């Protein structure tokens, strides 16, 4: 969809539809009051009649409003004016897009970006409107033989800002919002792919494809033979039961001549059966989403390719498949990781940390400024935080604060969990340096504690996205998270300013 920004009076807009807000109880927004004046009280008469209360998400579509050049006016309920926050703002944008898409309005001018949202500026409102609109219109229907097609879908949406000074800010917000939502789309498309198609080799092909389309990105793919030469035995153990070869794709974005790189490491288990410690059948189909970390890294690199910030970033897609087989690794095995540390396997379904620990050792060679790993790592994180926030752990307070700040700015929430030394005691082994699972108590934290043993040489953070990477049930599918958080973090690091 095409987006634009302008600053003008609502009654003078020649458009298929203009969108304005109404507050609860039956109170016109400032822009709606302008329309009411030029229409001799037409809107206020409708409200007095009880046609719209103004509750969040209510919609009323009007045709041929007197004194207004637009063909239609869409009144949108925004709840109580003083309570309009970022969550409600996204809800009303989502409902607005859905309604416009069904009205036959192929283009519209939206004045909702002039509403006051607590603690948010014009840049935030326009960018979030773009991201929300794009995500609302997302479909994954590649494998459907009969695709649903709207007769006259929404093609163009223009956001109005209060002053002409905000036009350049709005244009930058649209550019950022489009890049992030395009990155989210790539993330969602790859994650939603069925596991018979999205294998480690498929992940590698997508990494190469992005490099082919962007002069700032190069991709190198490392297969099992080279992994063996590097001593990545923990990573390889996970892949032993699968006929699909493990592949690690290393993508380098070069936007600065000599800055130290920030490294993003994405867990890429394209299917996780649990291995010998096999998972229950119910819900196992969703284990195709166990590569959500790698998908989010690919999506973030896609956003970087569009935004071209002056920063160096390395994205690693750690692709593998965890399957049961006569060659599969077993509970009781002891593995020697690339770092030389030994790991006693208690559960083959705690495999993501075995893949990641070797990749975290591998990336030492880049002498990174900081490393962030992203993984659908533990069900325990879902129990702790649900689907609203990703779990964050770090060995470096400033890095953790940067990521939390990026989560607030982007609306892609994260919550920090502790990594106290006491948790390390849960992963001690009588036979090796550590075990690969610390049991049920604090399971998300002990997984982070395990990874922390491989990150002594750099500043590191871990994002557990098991609760945020995908949805189940009627809305089943990838969410595209945490692409907004990661992209915002990198934009902040690159010093990208919002105002010109």
UniProtKB/Swiss-Prot annotation:
Mn(2+) 1 binds at residues 272, 349, 351. GO terms for molecular function: manganese ion binding; metalloaminopeptidase activity. Mn(2+) 2 binds at residues 267, 272, 290, 351. It catalyses: Release of an N-terminal amino acid, Xaa-|-Yaa-, in which Xaa is preferably Leu, but may be other amino acids including Pro although not Arg or Lys, and Yaa may be Pro. Amino acid amides and methyl esters are also readily hydrolyzed, but rates on arylamides are exceedingly low; Release of an N-terminal amino acid, preferentially leucine, but not glutamic or aspartic acids. Binds 2 manganese ions per subunit. SUPFAM superfamilies: Macro domain-like, Zn-dependent exopeptidases. Belongs to the peptidase M17 family. This is Probable cytosol aminopeptidase.
């Amino acid at each position: 969809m095409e987006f634009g920004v302008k600053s003008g009076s609502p009654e003078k807009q020649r458009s298929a539809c203009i969108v304005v807000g109404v507050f609860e109880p039956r109170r016109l927004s400032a822009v709606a009051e302008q329309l009411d004046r030029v229409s001799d009280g037409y809107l206020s008469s409708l409200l007095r009649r009880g046609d719209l209360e103004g509750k969040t998400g209510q919609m009323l579509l009007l045709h041929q409003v007197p004194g207004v050049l637009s063909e239609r006016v869409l009144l949108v309920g925004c709840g109580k004016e003083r309570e309009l926050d970022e969550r409600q703002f996204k809800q009303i944008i989502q409902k607005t897009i859905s309604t416009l898409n069904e009205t036959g309005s192929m283009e519209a001018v939206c004045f909702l970006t002039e509403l006051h949202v607590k603690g948010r500026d014009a840049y935030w409102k326009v960018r979030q409107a773009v991201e929300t609109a794009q995500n609302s219109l997302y479909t994954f229907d590649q494998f459907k033989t009969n695709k649903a097609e709207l007769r006259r879908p929404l093609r163009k949406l223009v956001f109005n800002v209060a002053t002409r000074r905000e036009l350049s800010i709005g244009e930058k917000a649209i550019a950022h919002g489009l890049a992030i939502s395009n990155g989210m789309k790539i993330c969602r498309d790859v994650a939603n792919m069925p596991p018979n198609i999205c294998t480690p080799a498929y992940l590698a092909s997508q990494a190469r494809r992005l490099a082919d389309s962007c002069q700032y990105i190069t991709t190198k793919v490392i297969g099992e033979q080279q992994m063996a030469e590097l001593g990545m035995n923990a990573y390889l153990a996970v892949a032993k039961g699968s006929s699909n070869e493990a592949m690690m794709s290393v993508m380098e974005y070069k936007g600065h001549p000599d800055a130290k790189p920030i490294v993003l490491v994405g867990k890429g288990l394209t299917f996780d059966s649990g291995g010998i410690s096999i998972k229950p059948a119910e819900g196992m189909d969703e284990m195709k989403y166990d590569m959500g970390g790698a998908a989010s890294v690919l999506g973030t690199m896609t956003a970087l390719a569009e935004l071209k910030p002056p920063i160096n970033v390395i994205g690693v897609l750690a692709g593998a498949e965890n399957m049961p087989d006569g060659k599969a690794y077993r509970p009781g095995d002891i593995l020697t990781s690339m770092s030389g540390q030994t790991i006693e396997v208690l559960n083959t379904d705690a495999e993501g940390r075995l893949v990641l620990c070797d990749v975290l050792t591998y990336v030492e060679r880049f002498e990174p400024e900081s490393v962030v790993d992203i993984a659908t790592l533990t069900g325990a994180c879902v129990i702790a935080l649900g689907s609203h926030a990703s779990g964050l752990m770090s060995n470096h307070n400033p890095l953790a604060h940067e990521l939390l700040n990026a989560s607030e700015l982007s609306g892609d929430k994260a919550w920090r969990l502790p990594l106290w030394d006491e948790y390390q005691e849960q992963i001690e082994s009588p036979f090796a340096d550590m075990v690969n699972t610390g049991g049920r108590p604090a399971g998300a934290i002990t997984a982070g504690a395990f990874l922390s043993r491989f990150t002594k040489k750099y500043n590191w953070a871990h994002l557990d996205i098991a609760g945020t990477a995908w949805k189940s049930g009627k809305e089943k599918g990838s969410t595209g998270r945490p692409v907004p958080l990661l992209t915002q973090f990198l934009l902040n690091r690159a010093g990208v300013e919002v105002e010109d």
